[in-house]
């Protein structure tokens, strides 16, 4: 069952290939003592497994996958269906396309029952992908325990692994890694940390832990383990493909979790933002400046505290007296759309607080309605995004106060769930506590507790905006987007929404820039194509004297490098909280002309280059929409089969794989992530092409052979970029 009827989508049945082995069952139900396991063929080359102890599920449990999938065999399982039941005393075999499930006992028929998953190779042989981890003298690989008196339980599910396995995806963490092998990842959202239990393995399978609960992912040497802190059902999916065929794995994942719609054209241009434009006059002067300087801009953003009170979900009329006039003037001067920030928090002095409280539309604490956080001296509670009525209330305010006045794009900041996810200032006290993550497990929602459904909150918040968009434009889910949202968090299948995810409030230093590259590649492997960053980083690092200061040459260099890199991201966006020696507005500047006379032409040249890449961008976004094919592409996606060095480089998380990537099928991007650089080393993979020198350096047109590290000129005005094939084809978008 879906969490909301909004997710209902008829299956788009894809004609199976002649060699496709249709499922030999609609499902197998195993009764194993107090435990029940339901295994169903799911989509192409996949199985869905659900397990529970004692009490059966209701069938209405929260799920992030389509049932039936967007693509799959026509007569496969759905809901809780099955055609075979067993007590677990007999071995069973199910097949779905190129994946096989076998059930086997160990240590005798009373010791347990293990599931094993195999891929059918092109030559007909079978390869073990993984099985339930059950060495001698160990806990059951499906381990349940009850930490409290209620019906919800905790679960730990363990699967076998090998030392040479490589793990890609898992959402985003600030860790310099694209291979997550060896990681322990807590599934708790906070600023710049979006753990999401979707991964691909170099062994030729992908895995989705289809659960809204907080928990943990562990990728050990011999064991992969997933835990759920509080649940009534364990639900996961495994899909198979041939080794190295990551496009097929992404197609399978997106067929289960959702395909991205096509973005509106304006979102692919340059997005201007800072903390913060304080009032209508500043925004109109900004638009006039872009117009007078003849610099293209596609969206201008109004950041937080533009409201009178938290939860008003309206611009403060004292600062923004005529919103419709402002948005029209911005449009007339620049052609740009507008976006405004909103937070999910509601202060008790908000005009909306009484109505939200009276109708049960706010999150609450376990022991009563109490407050869940504070901000700048006000007690606050988040609206309950898991409640459909709360989502409708939020959109009604946004439509009346923004959308109908010309601001039709929304920045859903602080959407991590639980609370704001940060304790900046505790009820107005003088002590400043910076970005301390906490889960607030005492928070309750309509859908459950923070422990049991906490990972749902940001996803449902994205859904609130999507539902509003679709109702306002009378369009169906999956159709092209007219507008966009921008979220600091997400979860399984967030790509189905017209919603960007950005990497959060990062610090303005070189190492943080480097970390963002790896973070974006993990986002891509998770299935999120709509990803971006704050160019220049968001906040000052207090240990680095020049960090974020637009008047220092040290920060200007970092900003130019960072901004150049965003040209080759799914979305090109600048934002940040800057410092300066000379301040002529409410906050320090962050516009293209703010970084010195010598740097302005460089910044503007990259903005123009972004628009020159428009046809290419539309082409790669269209493929992501149609098939789930990744936009940002870690090198293993394209070159693992043709270049034997790639696997070794990825295994060690070498900079040549964490700091460079393919942007679509033709561009190799290697951003400079160190200061004072005049040349930069780049690893050019072997492509398998007959062309002995397939790589062309963008700035010099010099060609290079693959399979080697080359050092190329990289002055401040040039980000290292190579292309395959002709530049003319690339710029025309004729690349597939």
Curated annotation (Swiss-Prot):
Record's keyword annotation contains Secreted: yes
pH-activity dependence text: Optimum pH is 3.0-4.0.
Biological process per Gene Ontology, one example term: carbohydrate metabolic process
UniProt KW Ligase keyword: no
Domain of life: Eukaryota
Main localization category: secreted
Localization annotation: Secreted
Keywords in alphabetical order: Glycoprotein, Glycosidase, Hydrolase, Secreted, Signal
UniProt GO MF annotations: alpha-D-xyloside xylohydrolase; carbohydrate binding
SUPFAM superfamilies in UniProt: (Trans)glycosidases (SSF51445), Galactose mutarotase-like (SSF74650), Glycosyl hydrolase domain (SSF51011)
Residues carrying covalently attached carbohydrate according to the record: 24, 279, 332, 376, 471, 655, 676, 690, 701
Active site: 413, 505 (proton donor)
InterPro entries: Gal_mutarotase_sf_dom, Glyco_hydro_31_C, Glyco_hydro_31_TIM, Glyco_hydro_b, Glycoside_hydrolase_SF, Glycosyl_Hydrolase_31
Activity as a function of temperature: Optimum temperature is 55 degrees Celsius.
Reaction catalyzed: Hydrolysis of terminal, non-reducing alpha-D-xylose residues with release of alpha-D-xylose
GO cellular component terms listed in the entry, alphabetical order: extracellular region; membrane
Record-listed E.C. numbers: 3.2.1.177
Signal peptide start-end: 1-18
Job description of the protein: Catalyzes the liberation of alpha-xylose from the non-reducing terminal glucose of xyloglucan oligosaccharides.
Recorded family membership: Belongs to the glycosyl hydrolase 31 family.
Protein name as it appears in the record: Alpha-xylosidase A
Organism, scientific name: Aspergillus niger (strain ATCC MYA-4892 / CBS 513.88 / FGSC A1513)
């Amino acid at each position: 069952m879906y969490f909301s009827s909004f997710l209902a989508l008829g299956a788009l049945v894809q004609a199976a290939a002649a060699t496709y082995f249709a499922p030999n069952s609609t499902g197998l139900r195993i009764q194993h003592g107090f435990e029940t396991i339901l295994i169903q063929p799911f989509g192409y080359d996949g199985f869905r497994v659900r397990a529970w102890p004692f009490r059966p599920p209701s069938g209405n449990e929260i799920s992030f996958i389509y049932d039936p999938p967007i693509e799959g065999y026509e007569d496969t399982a759905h809901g809780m269906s099955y055609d075979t039941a067993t007590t677990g005393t007999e071995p069973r075999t199910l097949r779905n396309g190129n994946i096989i499930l076998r059930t086997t006992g160990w240590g005798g028929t009373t010791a347990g029952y293990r599931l094993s998953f195999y891929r059918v190779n092109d030559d007909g042989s079978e390869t073990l992908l993984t099985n339930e981890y059950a060495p001698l003298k160990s806990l059951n690989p499906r381990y349940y325990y009850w930490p409290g008196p209620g019906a919800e339980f905790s679960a730990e599910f363990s699967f076998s692994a090998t030392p040479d396995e490589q793990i890609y995806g898992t959402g985003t963490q600030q860790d310099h890694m694209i291979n997550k092998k060896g990681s322990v990842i807590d599934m708790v959202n906070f600023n710049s940390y979006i753990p999401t239990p979707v991964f691909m393995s170099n062994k030729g399978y992908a895995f989705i832990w289809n659960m809204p609960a907080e928990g943990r992912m562990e990728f050990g040497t011999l064991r992969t383990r997933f835990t759920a802190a509080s649940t009534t059902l364990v639900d996961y999916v495994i899909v198979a493909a041939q080794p190295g065929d990551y496009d097929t794995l992404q197609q399978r994942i997106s067929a289960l979790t959702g395909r991205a719609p096509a973005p509106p054209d304006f979102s692919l241009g340059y997005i201007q933002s800072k903390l913060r434009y304080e009032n209508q006059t500043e925004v109109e002067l900004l638009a006039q400046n872009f117009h007078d300087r003849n610099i293209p801009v596609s969206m201008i953003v109004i950041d937080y505290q533009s409201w009178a009170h938290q939860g008003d979900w309206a611009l403060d009329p004292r600062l923004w007296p005529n919103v419709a006039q402002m948005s029209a003037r911005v449009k007339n001067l620049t052609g740009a759309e507008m976006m405004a920030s909103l937070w999910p928090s509601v202060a008790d002095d908000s005009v909306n607080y009484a109505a939200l409280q009276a109708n049960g539309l706010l999150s609450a604490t376990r022991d009563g309605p109490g407050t869940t956080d504070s901000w700048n001296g006000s007690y606050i509670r988040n609206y309950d995004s898991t409640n459909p009525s709360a989502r409708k209330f939020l959109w009604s305010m946004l439509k009346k106060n923004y959308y109908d006045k010309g601001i039709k794009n929304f920045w859903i900041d602080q959407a991590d769930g639980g609370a704001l996810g940060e304790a900046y200032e505790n009820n107005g006290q003088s002590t400043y506590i910076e970005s301390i993550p906490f889960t607030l497990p005492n928070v309750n929602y309509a859908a459950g507790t923070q422990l049991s459904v906490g990972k749902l909150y940001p996803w449902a918040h994205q859904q609130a905006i999507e539902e509003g968009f679709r109702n306002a434009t009378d369009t169906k889910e999956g159709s092209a987007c007219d507008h966009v949202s921008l979220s600091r968090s997400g979860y399984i299948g967030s790509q189905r929404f017209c919603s960007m995810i950005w990497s959060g409030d990062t610090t303005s230093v070189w190492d943080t820039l480097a970390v963002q590259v790896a973070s974006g590649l993990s986002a891509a492997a998770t299935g999120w194509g709509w990803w971006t960053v704050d160019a220049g980083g968001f906040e000052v690092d207090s240990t680095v004297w020049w960090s974020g200061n637009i008047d220092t040459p040290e920060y200007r260099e970092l900003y130019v490098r960072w901004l150049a890199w965003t040209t080759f991201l799914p979305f090109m966006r600048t934002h940040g909280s800057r410092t300066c020696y000379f301040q002529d507005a409410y906050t320090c500047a962050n516009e293209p002309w703010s970084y010195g006379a010598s740097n302005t032409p460089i910044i503007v040249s990259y903005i123009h280059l972004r628009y020159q890449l428009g046809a290419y961008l539309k082409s790669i976004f269209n493929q992501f929409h149609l098939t789930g094919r990744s936009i940002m592409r870690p090198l293993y996606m394209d070159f693992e089969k043709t270049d034997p060095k790639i696997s070794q480089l990825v295994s060690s998380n070498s900079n040549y794989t964490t700091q460079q990537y393919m942007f679509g099928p033709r561009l190799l991007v290697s951003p400079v992530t160190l200061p004072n650089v005049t040349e930069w080393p780049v690893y050019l993979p072997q492509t398998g092409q007959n062309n002995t020198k397939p790589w062309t350096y963008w700035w010099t047109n010099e060609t290079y052979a693959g399979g080697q590290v080359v050092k190329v000129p990289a002055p401040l005005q040039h980000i290292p970029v190579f292309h395959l094939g002709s530049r003319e084809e690339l710029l025309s978008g004729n690349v597939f």
